[in-house]
Design a protein with these regions (language model features):
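Alpha-helical cap/lid subdomain in secreted, periplasmic
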Residues: 1-109
Length: 109
């Protein structure tokens, strides 16, 4: 979790050093077997927590043009996967729709 936080903080700092372009951080979509596999659930939720800690820290510091898309906003369902991790066509469409909606929100602000 702390490693993810550090990596996100570093990545945003490197981008901000050169550009004020909007940055959209997107949470891990999870795994299809996470509801029945505690290890898989813990893995992706830990990664997402680490990223969220970095986002919150950056927002508290006043980092401009930083945005966030949550796991829940991605809206994956059981049919969104072809296996444990790779999205099906439906999953890819859900991800594209969620990212598109967020990008429209960012660009129209």
């Amino acid at each position: 979790e702390q490693e993810v936080t550090a990596l996100v903080l570093d990545a945003v700092a490197k981008i901000r050093a050169k550009s004020n372009t909007p940055i959209l951080l997107v949470e891990h979509a999870g795994y299809s077997n996470a509801p029945t596999n505690a290890a898989q659930y813990e893995l992706y939720t830990r990664l997402n927590r680490g990223q969220r800690v970095a986002f919150d820290k950056l927002m508290n510091e006043g980092t401009p043009n930083l945005f966030y898309l949550t796991h829940d906003q991605l809206g994956f369902s059981p049919d969104s996967w072809v296996d444990y991790v790779h999205p099906s066509d439906l999953g890819a469409q859900k991800q594209a729709d969620a990212v598109t909606a967020k990008l429209k929100e960012i660009l129209n602000r």
